[in-house]
UniProtKB/Swiss-Prot annotation:
GO terms for molecular function: 3'-5' DNA helicase activity; ATP binding; ATP hydrolysis activity; DNA/RNA helicase activity; flap-structured DNA binding; four-way junction DNA binding; four-way junction helicase activity. It comes from Candida glabrata (strain ATCC 2001 / BCRC 20586 / JCM 3761 / NBRC 0622 / NRRL Y-65 / CBS 138) (Yeast). This is ATP-dependent DNA helicase MPH1. SMART domains: DEXDc, HELICc. It holds the Pfam family ResIII.
Length: 1052
């Protein structure tokens, strides 16, 4: 269960504002007769009085907004026949919390729809909720509510999916809801639904509201905040005893129980005729022989249990599995019994429980169902006992008894005959079906109820073996997968001797693989054989269970006539709209009156029906006892032995009794279309589309503009909420007047400075002092600052920024007429552009008091220092080719197809004094890099001793810089740093490989140096030999360098 999102303070606030229920307790003391002595004195130690507490519950005005003009009357739809019991229950259900217990098929959904309709009229904004435990029941109520009462479909919502998508918006905008109790409970605890908004709650299958089921938890949560709401509980049987009825009344705050039976005076005239036939089936000779043999085998164990006082004395054939299980649980829970005695008694009772199950199966269901259970238990115990995994000698005396072996042999011989019927019920079942389909038309339907899946499949096979094409059976069970029997081979392989040698282990593994493959092949072959049989789908369902889709498909085929006999377990007893059924056959019976009544309520709804009850062994007495308990329960309820809870009237007290307004409800075309639907999923799908305004639930139809309503968090006043980025926490500087000039210059170089202030005015950037300081530290001569030629260009799309930046090295840049710096005025208007071009020597003017530069500037496409590559440093004798200076070609005409129209921003101005500029045109060979003395310090202090390949320190590179194109070396460095920042594995592997090669070269170089120094100490006669040896070593080194070239040609 989820925790509630409300804190204690919010809970108290909701409680105080929402609860209009007041409880007044009065303490009354009453005197008791006392014993007196001879002097008429009261004998001490006696209670002279007792205290009686009287509780009076009152309710204040409701907090719901009511439509005052509609409170004087309530509407009762006349679209169907007006029945007295329905009319009476609706009238009482509008003013009290009612538990409506009437037989199945008598219109409980109509009663609920009428109550929901009137509370929809009486209130303005309150919520009406219908809850049911299953989807089919919800679909039935949707049809009844929208297709009968005419409640607007745009005010209704269906909440069945587990997703919480748009749940808050649906609860806020709709008024009538059809859902399951789990959904409502979870949304209440999450704070999505306000419990004060609920004015009417309908609970279907209310007999489930016991213990910790969702119904009980849901009502308990609502009662904490809201007592002014109407609750209507629907069921066919409230409980099996008076204690269960009282628990349901307490959990649901019931004020009145309206119970009807098929014999009630106001309901009997609306009931269709039901003929009940009781058939007592005698056990066969084969069954009696097996029961007698089981009794002989279990008699020693039963006598020992009787002597120990843990089981009652009885004939072996009367052992009851349920009693044995209860006594075994009581022994386990008793801490006073010593452990040895406790477990001995437990295993004895467990064995009696297993024998009781065997006797029940063979007496009620037949030899086939009995033998599947019996064989599984015998195989499980004997396998474990033979391997030493069980030491229960008491159970061994039973399972290794000669009678058990005789039973196994006899049952195997009987089951081999395909025409063998394991019980007399199967023969009588055949006769009933043959006679029924002979006397009735083929449109008739039959349902057969049984508790066990094995029995259901046996019945299907028995009917199919009749080879009557007019009788088409199919199984109908739940979703759970069938229980697999004991796997003897798997258990032996797991717990048997495995061997200690490697050959034994490999042999065992090979055998396991072979056996698994054989098992898969056998399962596949068996599945193929099942599909070829008429009962193949039923056999597959019995093994793997039936999901909701398969269940819906079977019901659809049953209604259409493809199947006319449905063999159901308990899943077909409650809530499902299976259709009109003319014959019900109860293959077995239960001690629960709820199940028996639910079974018999499947027929006789719209036409007469017939019920066949098959009894064997003690089933007849068990059925009579359960029905007697049900009738006695009705008497106890009618005698007011149940303590009810007072409920709020909700309506103002001046409206003593609203008048009934019988009215024919006009149903819209959409609601009429809903009435014609039979499939549950179609009903739910149609109702969901109506809830959304007939808009299909597609991605395009969703409203993405509305922001999702988030949770409310309580925080101090004026606190900053939301996510704050690190960039917003940094105070940005817009001028160099109040801060360091170095930071401002870095911003200029990195092109991340804003030229305009908050008012849109252009700031004058004065960076003379910082530029002079940096230029003075250089070892090279200073140069004149040149004005920049700048063009304005539209900002590209965000998605194309990276692609354009990558292609900047190959783009053709349009040349504009250059502009010289005019020093007659301090300001000059310059056009802006992403692409920056250097001024040529012919068009640039010198800045006064500036020295000329002795070093040529770099070409426009080379932003960086011309240093020898790694290959050149390894081969110093090879001189790199000098690249001629590329002079920009001045285009006399502007090509509009190459470059867009240029616009000039005259408002952008810059201060151009000595040593200051925004974008530089001349770059020095070492500008932005370490100086010689700094490099020497770096190599001596921070460079590894064994490093032969080093990377020069470089400034911060901006890959998306569009004004100056990077050189090839710079592009490689940028790519390297990006790979290192993203921790790319390929780059790390490549760098490690290069590092290993470099270290190898360094080691070879040192060894060669040592050999050369030793050779210099030799005589001069060996100098020629030393020179030749040196040449050979250099050739070897050149060979290694040639191998390294392929690696160095790559991008690091």
């Amino acid at each position: 269960m989820e925790d509630s999102d409300f804190d204690d303070a919010e809970l108290d606030e909701l409680y105080e504002k929402a609860i209009n229920r007041r409880v007044n307790e009065t303490l009354i003391r009453r005197s008791l007769p006392v014993q007196r002595d001879l002097q008429n004195g009261v004998v001490p130690g006696q209670d002279t009085y007792y205290e009686e507490i009287r509780t009076e519950v009152t309710f204040g005005p409701t907090h719901h907004q009511l439509n005052e003009e509609l409170l004087h009357s309530y509407i009762y739809p006349t679209n169907f026949e007006v029945r007295d019991y329905q009319f009476d229950i609706v009238r009482k259900g509008l003013l009290q919390n009612i538990l409506c217990a009437i037989p199945t098929g008598m219109g409980k959904t109509f009663i609920a729809s009428t109550v929901m309709l009137n509370f929809f009229r009486w209130t303005k904004t309150a919520k009406i909720i219908f809850t049911a435990p299953t989807r089919p029941l919800v679909a039935q109520q949707i049809k009844a509510c929208l297709g009968i009462t005419g409640i607007p479909h745009d005010q209704t919502a269906i909440l069945l999916d587990k997703t919480r998508k748009n749940r808050e918006e649906i609860w806020a905008n709709k008024r009538v809801f059809f859902t399951t109790p789990q959904v409502v409970e979870n949304d209440l605890k999450r704070g999505v639904l306000n419990p004060k908004d609920i004015v009417c709650l309908v609970i279907d299958e209310a007999h489930r509201a016991t213990g910790s089921y969702a119904y009980a938890n849901l009502v308990k949560f609502i009662n904490r905040f809201n007592s002014s709401y109407r609750l209507l509980a629907l069921t066919a049987t409230p409980a099996t005893d008076i204690e269960g009825v009282q628990e349901v009344v307490n959990n649901l705050n019931i004020s009145k129980i309206e119970i009807r039976t098929e014999e009630s005076m106001d309901i009997v005239k609306y009931m269709k005729k039901k003929i009940k036939d009781r058939v007592n089936i005698q056990t066969t000779v084969e069954i009696e022989n097996i029961v007698e043999q089981l009794g002989i085998a279990i008699l020693p164990v039963l006598n020992q249990a009787v002597e120990l006082g843990i089981y009652e004395s009885c004939p072996p054939s009367a052992i009851n599995a349920f009693k044995a299980m209860q006594k075994s649980q009581a022994i386990i829970m008793n801490p006073s019994i010593p452990e040895g005695i406790k477990w001995r008694n437990y295993f004895i009772l467990q064995l009696l429980n297993h024998v009781g199950q065997m006797l029940k199966r063979i007496k009620i269901y037949g030899i086939r169902t009995f033998f599947s259970y019996f064989q599984n238990k015998v195989k499980e115990f004997t396998t474990k006992y033979d391997l030493g995994k069980s030491t229960n000698k008491i159970a061994a005396g039973f399972y290794y008894h000669p009678m058990i072996q005789a039973i196994t042999k006899e049952c195997e011989e009987k089951i081999k005959d395909p025409n063998f019927l394991g019980h007399g019920k199967l023969e009588h079942l055949r006769d009933e079906l043959t006679q029924f389909f002979y006397e009735n038309p083929f449109e008739s339907r039959v349902i057969i109820f049984t508790e066990l899946r094995e029995s259901a499949l046996e019945i299907v096979k028995c009917i199919d073996s009749m080879e009557n094409s007019e009788i088409r059976p199919h199984i109908f069970i739940g979703q759970a997968k069938g229980k697999e029997g004991f796997d003897e081979v798997k258990f032996v392989r797991k717990h048997g001797p495995k061997g200690r040698k490697k050959s034994d282990r490999e042999k065992r593994l090979e055998e396991e693989r072979r056996m698994d493959e054989e098992k898969k092949q056998a399962a596949l072959q068996e599945k193929l054989e099942r599909t070829s049989r008429r009962t193949g789908s039923s056999e597959e369902a019995q093994l793997s269970g039936m999901n909701q889709k398969q269940q819906k498909e079977v019901i659809k085929k049953f209604k259409s006539g493809l199947y006319n006999v449905l063999v159901c377990t308990s899943i077909g007893e409650e809530g499902l709209d299976i259709g009109e059924v003319d014959l019900i056959i109860c293959y077995d019976t239960t001690s629960s009156p709820i199940k028996n009544i639910q079974r018999m309520g499947r027929t006789g709804r719209k036409r007469d029906g017939r019920i066949v009850l098959m009894f064997s062994s003690n089933e007849a007495s068990k059925f009579d006892q359960s029905m007697n308990d049900y009738y006695n329960l009705q008497k106890l309820i009618s005698q007011h032995l149940v303590q009810y809870r007072k409920s709020d009237r909700i309506l103002p007290p001046e409206n003593q009794e609203p008048e009934c307004e019988k009215k024919f409800i006009e149903v819209s075309e959409e609601d009429q279309e809903l009435n014609n639907m039979e499939d549950t999923d179609d009903v739910i799908r149609f109702a969901t589309q109506c809830m959304l305004g007939k808009i299909p639930k597609t991605k395009k139809g969703r409203d993405k503009g509305k922001a999702k309503k988030g949770k409310t968090f309580f925080m101090p006043d004026n606190v900053i909420t939301g996510i704050i980025t690190a960039n917003n926490l940094v105070r940005k500087r817009k001028s160099a007047q109040n801060g360091s000039g170095a930071a401002l210059l870095d911003s200029i170089v990195n092109d991340d400075i804003d030229l305009e202030d908050e008012d849109g005015q252009v700031e004058i950037l004065d960076v003379d002092q910082e530029v002079n300081r940096r230029l003075a530290s250089n070892a090279v001569q200073k140069t004149n600052d040149m004005a920049l030629q700048i063009r304005n260009e539209e900002t590209p799309e965000i998605g194309d920024t990276r692609n354009k930046a990558k292609a900047s090295s190959s783009m053709k840049v349009k040349k504009e007429p250059t502009m010289a710096v005019d020093h007659s005025d301090d300001e000059e208007d310059l056009p802006l552009s992403r692409h920056v071009e250097r001024a040529s020597r012919e068009t640039a003017k010198e800045v006064p008091n500036a020295t000329n530069v002795a070093e040529k500037p770099f070409p426009p496409l080379e932003f960086g220092v011309q240093r020898p590559s790694k290959r050149q440093r390894l081969q110093p004798e090879v001189q790199p080719e000098v690249q001629p200076e590329v002079q920009p070609e001045v285009q006399p005409e502007v090509q509009p197809e190459v470059q867009p129209e240029v616009t000039v921003k005259p408002e952008v101005k810059i201060k151009t004094e000595e040593g200051s500029k925004l974008y530089k045109n001349i770059f020095f060979s070492d500008e932005g890099f370490l100086q010689p003395h700094e490099k020497e310090l770096f190599l001596s202090k921070y460079n590894p001793e064994d490093a032969t390949v080093t990377i020069e320190p470089v400034p911060r590179f901006v890959r998306a810089h569009g004004r100056v194109k990077h050189s090839k070396r710079t592009e490689q460095l940028i790519t390297l740093f990006e790979d290192m920042n993203h921790n790319r594995v390929a780059r790390t592997i490549e760098m490690n490989k290069l590092r290993g090669i470099a270290r190898r070269l360094h080691t070879v170089s040192q060894s060669q140096g040592q050999s050369n120094s030793q050779s210099q100490a030799h005589s001069t006669s060996q100098k020629s030999q030393q020179a030749s040896q040196k040449d050979r070593s250099s050739q070897d080194k050149d060979l290694t360098n040639s191998e390294l070239e392929d690696l160095l040609d790559s991008d690091f």
